[in-house]
Each structure stands twice: as C-alpha cells, then as structure tokens.
Amino acid sequence: MGEVTDELGRSFVTPFDRENIQNFCQYLYRIPKMIERVVQRMELHGLNAGRTDFLHQIDIILEEAALMEGMVAHLIHKRNAKQMMHNVALLHNLEQKGDDTLQDLLSSLFAESRDVKDLMLRKDIYDMLEKVIDRYAMRRQ
C-alpha cells in the first residue's frame, strides 16, 4: 500500500481520485489478511490446503490475484480503460464461478460427510475462501 501512496504523491490526481485510490488500496490490503486467517484456521484444525476440495476455490483466488495485479498496473501506468473494464468483467465472472463452486462444494459436503466436526470445519473454510473470492470482485462482507 505504501508504494501506491508514494506514487500518488508524485502524480497529479485530484483529491477525489486520490481518496478513491487510497480506499481501493485499503480494500485490497485486507485480502492477504483474510488469506492469513484462512491459513491460521486450517493450521489450527490440522486441515491440509492441498485437499482437492479447497483447491477449487484456491485456483479461483489465484486467477483473481493475477487479474488484479494487471489492473493495478493499468492504474499506475494509466493504460487502456477498455482493457480495465474487460478485467473487471472477468473478475465478476470469477466471482460467479466462486459462488457456483461453493454451492457444489456444500452439496457434496452435506451429501458425503458423516463427521459433524469435519463438516463444520470444512464449511467454515469454504465460507472464508468465498469471502476472499468476493473481496476481489469488490463485494463487501
């Protein structure tokens, strides 16, 4: 976040633009914090991130991260607005894919799991990962 704030100080943008960009940076800053909480929860309960059920959501998060990295570069270098809007649409498509994936995971979980503790822990992780997916699409939690 510091790099973006420094760049803002060197760039001519209106105070409104500067405030929006700083809000955007703070919004993005929370994503790694959310991911850290997921990792902590998984470690606390001895859950393996390599489980195939978690990988579906993790793959979506990685795709979103790559898109967001490109979008931030577009903002910094004031590049093609059309490409930026295309990336926003792709983020929203990934968010919808995340919603669909969550529904599939929950359906499978409730159909297959007989262990209540495992069911609750996995559901909790699914929900936390879904919040990360939503965050990239700029959905408030």
Regions found by a protein language model. Give the residues of each.
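Cytosolic, long alpha-helical scaffolding segments
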Residues: 1-141
